[in-house]
Amino acid sequence: MSGQSESIAAIATAFGSAGVGIVRVSGPLAKRIGETLTGQSLKARHAIHAHLRDGAGDILDDAVVLYFQGPQSYTGEDVLELQAHGNPALLNAILRECRRLGARDARPGEFTERAFLNEKRDLEQAEAGADLISGQSE
């Protein structure tokens, strides 16, 4: 494993309003961030429904929350997925809370980079994923 010491976070769904939007966190703080936002204990590969709360205790949204313990995750690190309503302002508020709790903004492609560095994806798979995401044709 690459031994990444920083936790990263990003909105993982396309920009714009949608029924569901996902905020993803990867790194050593992922579980703690999830437990702080939900007020619940998280178990690996177990989905929960929870209110996500900000630092003042106010409810941000209802969400489905999934925690994947590394190395059994996409990046090979601890990963948190917060599946909330897809309002961009709401997703940005959730992302702000993740930053407040210690994660930094992920660079474009950084989740896949970590997957590659942790030998969860080979170069061909990483490049194919990037091509799929940036593709403009059918």
What residue ranges belong to the model's regions?
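A glycine-rich (often HGG/GG-containing) alpha/beta subdomain
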Residues: 1-138
